[in-house]
Swiss-Prot record:
The keyword Plastid applies. PANTHER family: PHOTOSYSTEM I REACTION CENTER SUBUNIT VIII, PTHR35775. This is Photosystem I reaction center subunit VIII. One of its GO terms (cellular component) is chloroplast thylakoid membrane. It comes from Acorus gramineus.
């Protein structure tokens, strides 16, 4: 295992997954407020 390949794969994955989770949680929060 090389230390150069891990960041090149791990960083973009976190850069895509973290904003997706943040947007999903915010979207669900807005939906709950609209329903109530």
């Amino acid at each position: 295992m090389t230390d150069l390949n891990l960041p090149s794969i791990f960083v973009p994955x976190v850069g895509l997954v973290f904003p997706a989770i943040a947007m999903a949680s915010x979207f669900l929060h807005v939906q709950k407020n609209k329903i109530v």
